[in-house]
Amino acid sequence: MKNILIIGCGLLGSSLLRRISKKKIAKKIFIYEKSKSNIAKIKRLKLPGTIVKSLKEGASNSDLIIFCTPMSEYKNIILKINKFIPSKTLITDIGSSKIETSKIINKFLKKGIQWIQSHPIAGSEVSGPEHGKENMFTDRWCIIIKEKNIKKNNINILTKFWKKIGAKVVVMSAEKHDKIFSITSHLPHLIAYNLVKSAQDFEKKQNYELIKYSAGGLRDFSRIAASNEIMWRDIFFNNKNNISKAIDLFIKNLNQFKKDINSKNNKSIVKKLTQTKKVRSKIIKLKQDIDKPDFGRN
């Protein structure tokens, strides 16, 4: 690839920027960032690439365009760059829900342009280019979404790109993707936000100093709950049907736990705790985390 445009240079956008530059995946990297604060940080950090003042300047000269913005901004960006995109340019993104994005692409993107959705499974609760890491995507899964109108050769091109970035690639449908991540990512974040909110409400209602006594459990949930609120609002809204079903399943299991606790059902509780404990071992075995206390953060 000769030229790549990164639209949005926050945590993940800047991580891509660092990696593309180090691996010399493109001859030129263009950066479009509307936040003056982020632009100042990019300059202060002396990150590689060329900051462009307009989407036209970047889009008209790029072989690959990567959307690294909140999903709620996709439509407006598409409408701004449509007439400037060269016919052979590929577009991808890093969004966490795909069905709604497919609808936006099909409705607003100029006909003939290939947008192949991506979802690299990487990130952090912090945001901004100062927190980006060159190895952010190393050995992480990247989901590529296959749709009817997508050319196989273009999927191969994008697959090679993500492998050069360091990711492990798997191809699946938007429907399958959104169902999987409603459980593995979206529901856990929703639970984290609500657990921390419950702690706040309890502290206020009981007039206890509660937060300062946070044990490991609440502390780890609070880390997740510190994630970018705009990004997660978009995810919750865009995958609302699957997330609603995941919430129903969680409530069903939570009510069963409540019933077992109140009735002191030893057999049922121990069985559930034993079964769920095995998931942690499986996650480590699949190299999705490390087997160290405190998740290796110390």
Identify the role of each PLM range.
Residues 1-60:
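NAD(P)+-binding Rossmann beta1-loop-alpha1 motif at the extreme N-terminus of oxidoreductases
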Residues 3, 28, 114, 141, ...:
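Residues at the starts of beta-strands that form the adenosine-phosphate
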Residues 56-85, 89-90:
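Rossmann-like NAD(P)-binding element
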Residues 68-70, 95, 146:
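Glycine-rich, N-terminal phosphate-binding loop of Rossmann-like dinucleotide-binding domains
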Residues 77-130:
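Rossmann-like NAD(P)(H) cofactor-binding subdomain of soluble oxidoreductases
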Residues 134-220:
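Internal alpha-helical scaffold of NAD(P)-dependent oxidoreductase catalytic cores
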Residues 207-275:
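Interdomain hinge/lid region at the active-site interface
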